[in-house]
A protein has these predicted regions:
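N-terminal acidic leader/helix
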Residues: 1-22
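Short, charge-rich amphipathic interface segments used for partner binding and complex assembly
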Residues: 19-57
């Protein structure tokens, strides 16, 4: 249950980061977009890792 809750929290965080990215996509703000894209990728990677750990406990 704890891993599932953590995975859901990471998904919500990723959604929030995506929400920050969306309005900036048409801008020239690579100084902001680049770290946001990196954060999005890292959160997605963390989600997958937690998901694998959760499956391993079954």
């Amino acid at each position: 249950a704890e891993l599932s809750a953590l995975e859901e929290h990471l998904a919500r965080c990723r959604d929030r980061v995506e929400g920050l990215i969306t309005p900036l996509r048409s801008s020239e703000r690579e100084d902001i977009l680049s770290p946001l894209y990196e954060s999005e990728r890292l959160l997605r990677s963390a989600e997958r890792a937690i998901s694998r750990a959760e499956r391993a406990t079954r």
